Amino acid sequence: MKEIRGKKLKLLLKEEDIKRRVKELAKEIESSYSWEEPIVVVGLLKGAFIFLADLVRAFDRFVFVEFMQVSSYGKGMKSSGTIKIVKDLDMDIEGKEVLLVDDILDTGLTMKEIHDYLLMKKPKVLKTCVFLDKKERRKVDFNADFVGFEVPDKFLVGYGLDWGEYGRNLPEVYMVED
């Protein structure tokens, strides 16, 4: 059994199930945009980068890729609730069709705040996609337009999600056991 930082890991999502769902999501997303020009896919670093890389490679069309980095976790296992933009967009998204991508939606605070921030930049369309959704942790009324998997309220690692930088590179998603 795998362990991180002295805690056992229990498999939640297998690599093949993740790959299948990412391809399905790409098709769903593709059908929801006009594609008059490539959409701008904005990934939230660091957690979303693996999901985002697989997602954009599953599209049958060209996309522009942008990154933002926000901080709300620190080194713990719970969100601090304070959101800080560490890296902003390099590209102007005014009048563009945009997809905001993150690894996990739990309280909704980060996604809602970044979504509202991006709306101020006047995109033509702004939709959201998350790899994982912990609906039972929601503190604000915010739901993603596209969701990979709904997951239980457990601390998760793998496929981009980490615990103090550990576990991000795992190809599956695991629950950290108490």
From Swiss-Prot:
It is found in: Cytoplasm. GO terms for molecular function: guanine phosphoribosyltransferase activity; hypoxanthine phosphoribosyltransferase activity; magnesium ion binding; nucleotide binding. Pfam families: Pribosyltran. PROSITE patterns: PUR_PYR_PR_TRANSFER. Disulfide bonds: none annotated. Purine salvage pathway enzyme that catalyzes the transfer of the ribosyl-5-phosphate group from 5-phospho-alpha-D-ribose 1-diphosphate (PRPP) to the N9 position of the 6-oxopurines hypoxanthine and guanine to form the corresponding ribonucleotides IMP (inosine 5'-monophosphate) and GMP (guanosine 5'-monophosphate), with the release of PPi. It is an enzyme of class 2 (transferase). It comes from the Bacteria. NCBIfam families: HGPRTase (TIGR01203). Belongs to the purine/pyrimidine phosphoribosyltransferase family. Keywords: Cytoplasm, Glycosyltransferase, Magnesium, Metal-binding, Nucleotide-binding, Purine salvage, Transferase. Its main location: cytoplasm. Mg(2+) binds at D103. It comes from Aquifex aeolicus (strain VF5). One of its GO terms (cellular component) is cytosol. Diphosphate binds at K46, G47, R168. GO terms for biological process: GMP salvage; guanine salvage; hypoxanthine metabolic process; IMP salvage; purine ribonucleoside salvage. Its EC number is 2.4.2.8. This is Hypoxanthine-guanine phosphoribosyltransferase. The active site is at D106 (proton acceptor). It catalyses: IMP + diphosphate = hypoxanthine + 5-phospho-alpha-D-ribose 1-diphosphate; GMP + diphosphate = guanine + 5-phospho-alpha-D-ribose 1-diphosphate. Its cofactor is Mg(2+). CDD domains: PRTases_typeI. GMP binds at K134, F155, L156, D162.
